[in-house]
């Protein structure tokens, strides 16, 4: 049984394109559907930039790019995936903490996460860890989406999630084109940028790297990324990642996630960089020890 059966054309038609190739970083949870009672129900946490390809690799085995710990212990279902991470580094850190809750400094205030409870399933244990992770920093500041890929596993979270996080259902697809299929993901029109930051009034030296503008197309806001982040964090001392706020120029409501998405769409990602990034990242395979917890 395969969460992404290549011959299941009906499920292909129901997939939602959520990101451009080169802009997707997800941390997923697999559950074994093996008939062998030694493996059935075991779980695996992993990272991917291409969920459809990754589940195929896991089910095909080590020789085809799958992980050692999932080889010959399936078939596997990819039951859920957390995505919306700003880059692969943040996603890999999230993956590691989910795999190793007893070692993560972010989760040290939850000693109950160190071990699976006696009658708790491996899935319930992983889900309990995730519920706590999404409520602590820095992850509770990120514009993450929790996507259920298999409705049979779907359930309410043990703890309330931050209001800016989405809980959605359905298969996920990554577009190789330069545009997503949804209207809000169209490449923005060219922007007439100012040469100076509206907040610090200093010259923007590396505009492609450090410049941000408002999501309102009629607004001429031009800022250093750090200046705008600090401005939006004005009412939230002690944090480093803004969730959103009001534009200092047009007073339009801003979402930090939307600002970064707009920046990426304006810059684009060269084909050679997209291919290199995906090939490099998919070679990173940190085995999860969660399924071996007594």
From Swiss-Prot:
Its EC number is 3.1.-.-. PROSITE patterns: GIY_YIG. The keyword Cell division does not apply. One of its GO terms (biological process) is double-strand break repair via homologous recombination. It is found in: Nucleus. Residues 23-109 form the GIY-YIG domain. Pfam families: GIY-YIG (PF01541), SLX1_C (PF21202). GO terms for cellular component: Slx1-Slx4 complex. Belongs to the SLX1 family. This is Structure-specific endonuclease subunit SLX1 homolog. It comes from Drosophila erecta (Fruit fly).
């Amino acid at each position: 049984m395969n969460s992404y059966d290549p011959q299941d054309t009906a499920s292909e038609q129901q997939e939602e394109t959520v990101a451009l190739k080169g802009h997707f970083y997800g941390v997923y949870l697999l559950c074994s559907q093996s008939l062998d009672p030694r493996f059935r129900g075991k779980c695996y946490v992993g990272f991917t930039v291409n969920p459809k390809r990754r589940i195929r690799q896991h089910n095909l085995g080590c020789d085809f790019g799958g992980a050692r710990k999932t080889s010959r212990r399936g078939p596997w279902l990819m039951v859920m995936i957390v995505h919306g991470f700003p880059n692969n580094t943040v996603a890999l850190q999230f993956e590691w903490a989910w795999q190793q809750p007893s070692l993560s400094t972010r989760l040290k205030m939850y000693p109950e996460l160190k071990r699976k409870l006696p009658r708790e399933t491996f899935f319930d244990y992983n889900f309990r860890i995730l519920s706590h992770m999404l409520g602590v920093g820095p992850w509770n500041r990120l514009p993450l989406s929790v996507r259920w890929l298999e409705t049979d596993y779907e359930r309410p979270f043990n703890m309330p999630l931050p209001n800016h996080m989405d809980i959605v259902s359905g298969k996920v697809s990554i577009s190789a084109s330069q545009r997503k299929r949804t209207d809000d993901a169209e490449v923005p029109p060219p922007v007439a940028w100012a040469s100076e930051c509206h907040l610090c009034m200093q010259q923007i030296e590396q505009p492609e790297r450090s410049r941000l503008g408002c999501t309102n197309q009629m607004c001429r806001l031009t800022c250093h990324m750090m200046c705008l982040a600090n401005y939006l964090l004005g009412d939230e001392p002690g944090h480093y990642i803004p969730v959103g706020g009001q534009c200092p120029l047009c007073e339009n409501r801003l979402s930090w996630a939307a600002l970064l998405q707009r920046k990426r769409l304006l810059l684009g990602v060269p084909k050679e960089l997209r291919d290199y990034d995906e090939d490099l990242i998919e070679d990173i395979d940190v085995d999860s020890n969660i399924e071996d917890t007594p």
